[in-house]
A protein has these predicted regions:
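Secretory pathway targeting signatures of secreted, lumenal, and periplasmic proteins
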Residues: 180-228
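Surface-exposed beta-loop interaction hotspot
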Residues: 1-13, 63, 151-177
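Beta-propeller blade termini
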Residues: 1-8, 53-63, 114-124
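Acidic/hydrophobic-patterned starts of short beta strands in beta-sheet-rich repeat architectures
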Residues: 8-19, 62-74, 122-134
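Structural motif
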Residues: 23-33, 77-90, 136-157
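Beta-propeller fold detector
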Residues: 40-47, 96-102, 161-166, 180
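Conserved blade-ending motifs and adjacent loop-strand segments that build the rim/top face
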Residues: 97-120
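Surface-exposed amphipathic alpha-helical segments
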Residues: 239-262
Length: 262
């Protein structure tokens, strides 16, 4: 269920319902608009038959030409998540599936096996970003390869394919750390000595750029370690080791997102 002004009437609110799965699979969306104080159904739209089979979340955003759109996160095969984009076309007065540049195959482009990864405005620019797990982000060493995955978030909000944001997701602590695009494919991440976190290094692992660790709340900050966030009864700390263009303590503080929060 999602309440949003999709039809652009400004003085009313529209309602989008994801209806229960039918025997054909996929998801059926129902668009209702407020008429004289009552929600009335104006459209149903069937999506994703054979590709996904249940809605996990709906998100509203504004894309190119200020057009209203929806991002739907949907279950695929029960153990994976994909996303689809639906536009509201003011001329026809209806919702339509949209495959913008870079998203000709949504199920392949947005597939992720960490099903807790839902779409969101990850960079704070007002558009909805879709996460995708990628294989070319860098080298994840054992044992951190069990908890970390490289992500590329894209918003597909304009004709050129939208903005993208590269980084690493820690599934154990449920946070995303954005990294400079120049690190894409050129870094190694390995565990730190105390097994409390991980080190971002150059491709060969010979130069450490920074360390991320999770420690008790009463662990004091120091000249080296600064608190980035509080995670339950623990704190996330960061330490810069070797300078890297575009990566700084201020950058880490501004671009680390706890995904358990809105």
């Amino acid at each position: 269920l999602l309440l949003a002004d999709l039809t652009g009437k400004k003085d009313t609110t529209d309602l989008v319902l994801a209806l229960p799965e039918n025997e054909m699979g996929g998801v059926t969306l129902q668009l209702l608009t407020n008429v004289d104080g009552e929600f009335r159904s104006i459209q149903t739209l069937a999506l994703g038959a054979g590709s996904y089979n249940g809605c996990a979340a709906l998100h509203a955003g504004t894309g190119r030409d200020d057009a209203a759109y929806l991002v739907m996160d949907a279950w695929a095969d029960g153990n994976a998540m994909v996303s689809d984009i639906i536009l509201y076309d003011a001329e026809s007065g209806s919702l339509q599936a949209s495959h913008p540049l870079g998203l000709s195959d949504p199920q392949r482009s947005t597939l992720r096996y960490h099903t807790e990864l839902l779409s969101r405005d990850i960079d704070g620019n007002g558009t909805v970003d879709i996460p995708a797990e990628i294989d070319d982000g860098g080298d994840l060493q054992t044992p951190v390869d069990k908890r970390l995955v490289f992500l590329l978030w894209k918003d597909y909000a304009n004709n050129s394919g939208g903005n993208s944001l590269f980084g690493v997701y820690d599934s154990k602590e449920n946070f995303f750390m954005a990294l400079p695009e120049s690190m894409h494919g050129s870094i190694m991440i390995r565990g730190n000595q105390s097994s409390t976190g991980w080190l971002i290094c150059n491709r060969e692992g010979t130069v450490v750029y920074c360390e991320m660790r999770v420690v008790d709340l009463d662990e004091p900050e120091s000249i080296e370690y600064e608190r980035i966030a509080t995670i339950g009864s623990q704190q996330l700390q960061a330490r810069m080791v070797t300078s890297y263009y575009g990566l700084s303590m201020d950058y880490i503080k501004s671009n680390t997102v706890l995904l358990g929060t809105a």
